Amino acid sequence: MRPPSRCPGMRHNDGVSDIVRVLLLGSTGSIGTQALEVIAANPDKFEVVGLAARGGNPALLAEQMAATGTRNVAVADPAAGAALDIKLAGPHAVTELVRRTEADVVLNALVGSLGLEPTLATLTAGTRLALANKESLVAGGSLVTRAAAPGQIVPVDSEHSALAQCLRGGRADEVDRLVLTASGGPFRGWTAQMLESVNPEAAKAHPTWSMGLMNTLNSASLVNKGLELIETHLLFGIPYDRIDVTVHPQSIVHSMVTFVDGSTLAQASPPDMKLPIALALGWPDRVPGAAAACDFSTASTWTFEPVDTEVFPAVELARQAGQAGGSVTAVYNAANEVAVQAFLDGRIRFPEIVRTVARAVEAADRWRAEPETVEDVLAADRWARGRAAELVGA
């Protein structure tokens, strides 16, 4: 286990400053738009050398192309490609863009399993990967970690960015436990019975973070924290039984590392994704003014409490999926995506999201073998989606 390393292949301009060439995947999403703001605010540090998106918001993508001046663009949706006269379009277009673009860092902010192949292409090319697409790591598992050189993946999630920063404070053999923090979501303190009446609008309201729809819904069910638990194990190599999750409603402390001597290092900052985005783009260097700092001149309280695992079983279910090994984590992720859509469509109640995931994971014994190819992962993904669709009555 080691913190991410310095960006390979960074070029030098005028022998004075380093300009990091950024290929941004998922540019029209929440992380992508914030990343472009970070880049625009730091033209002496970063430049955009390519954009990619699924294609659901072609108008915004057109604006981004104009603002960045790049025509090196790919979209997964052929219709969006035709509308914007983008030649590189289709299901493998984003991966092809990664292969043909010279970049110092690829920021993968795609949503869902669409990000897996671009993640592997980035790692194969030896380019630093700023990873916000947690699903590609969770689904790909050992397939992704085997493809990565030590320190090649830099996390963008605030929790894993916090862990990477805290791990600078000690050696690998000094680490005792990793502690992920969770806001608890909009339904913290609710009973299981109360959750039965939750509607999609209530689940879309996160108390502290501004995120995309899928991440917001996953945060409400704590599936997001389950995915982050799996990601933590894969990124840092710490066994699942040495990774804890605690509820911290203020979302100021983003994660902690406890060392063998009893000391704990925590990374704290007001909730703003621009900080971990900027750090991932410039790693290991910090970007001055990336986000506001904590204000200790006014009274404030930071609280911590255990996760109510009976009401919110998603975290422990993720731990079980991870300990099962193989592609069971891919099953966890894919079944959740199907169940979330069923909830949004009004076909199941909110607690049935995690119940559906649990039933899919329980039936996933055939997927315990370690994946050897992308097709192995996609096969588990397809099976899980089919199984979840049956369970939700699709």
UniProtKB/Swiss-Prot annotation:
InterPro entries, alphabetized: DXP_reductoisomerase, DXP_reductoisomerase_C, DXP_reductoisomerase_N, DXPR_C, DXPR_C_sf, NAD(P)-bd_dom_sf
TM spans (from-to): none
Binding site for NADPH: T28, G29, S30, I31, N57, N133, E135, G212
Role of this protein: Catalyzes the NADPH-dependent rearrangement and reduction of 1-deoxy-D-xylulose-5-phosphate (DXP) to 2-C-methyl-D-erythritol 4-phosphate (MEP).
Homology family: Belongs to the DXR family.
Keywords: Isoprene biosynthesis, Manganese, Metal-binding, NADP, Oxidoreductase
UniProt keyword annotation of Transit peptide present: no
An example molecular function term from Gene Ontology annotations: 1-deoxy-D-xylulose-5-phosphate reductoisomerase activity
EC category: oxidoreductase
UniProt pathway: Isoprenoid biosynthesis; isopentenyl diphosphate biosynthesis via DXP pathway; isopentenyl diphosphate from 1-deoxy-D-xylulose 5-phosphate: step 1/6
NCBIfam families: Dxr
Binding site for 1-deoxy-D-xylulose 5-phosphate: K134, S158, E159, S183, H206, S219, N224, K225, E228
GO biological process: isopentenyl diphosphate biosynthetic process, methylerythritol 4-phosphate pathway involved in terpenoid biosynthetic process
Cofactor: Mg(2+); Mn(2+)
Protein name: 1-deoxy-D-xylulose 5-phosphate reductoisomerase
Binding site for Mn(2+): D157, E159, E228
Catalytic activity: 2-C-methyl-D-erythritol 4-phosphate + NADP(+) = 1-deoxy-D-xylulose 5-phosphate + NADPH + H(+)
PANTHER family noted in UniProt: 1-DEOXY-D-XYLULOSE 5-PHOSPHATE REDUCTOISOMERASE, 1-DEOXY-D-XYLULOSE 5-PHOSPHATE REDUCTOISOMERASE, CHLOROPLASTIC
EC number of this enzyme: 1.1.1.267
